[in-house]
């Protein structure tokens, strides 16, 4: 399966990385590297991740990583990563 990063995810991740890098650019780079590596594991068994608490669709799942929730959609041949949430009621807050 191919992983597609939607603009909503990329923008939110970049914003969070900017915030982390204020304190430590090295930690920001490590956070990004570790997160991308975890996301790359999704295609091996995407349904092992919990059903999203933000959506009622069985194909939308949540990957919890260091207090953040990465929301992704499982399609036939792709995984669409579109949400990056921390302490929000909705992934679009």
Residue ranges of each PLM-predicted region?
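Absolute protein N-terminus
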Residues: 1-2, 93
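Enriched for short, Lys/Arg-rich terminal
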Residues: 65-69, 73-93
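Basic, Lys/Arg-enriched alpha-helical interface segments
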Residues: 2-60
């Amino acid at each position: 399966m191919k992983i597609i990063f939607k603009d909503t995810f990329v923008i939110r991740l970049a914003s969070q990385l900017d915030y982390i890098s204020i304190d430590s650019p090295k930690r920001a780079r490590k956070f990004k590297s570790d997160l991308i590596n975890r996301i790359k594991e999704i295609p091996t068994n995407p349904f092992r991740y919990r059903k999203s608490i933000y959506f009622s669709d069985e194909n939308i799942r949540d990957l919890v990583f260091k207090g953040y929730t990465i929301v992704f959609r499982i399609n036939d041949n792709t995984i669409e990563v579109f949400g990056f949430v921390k302490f929000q009621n909705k992934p679009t807050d």
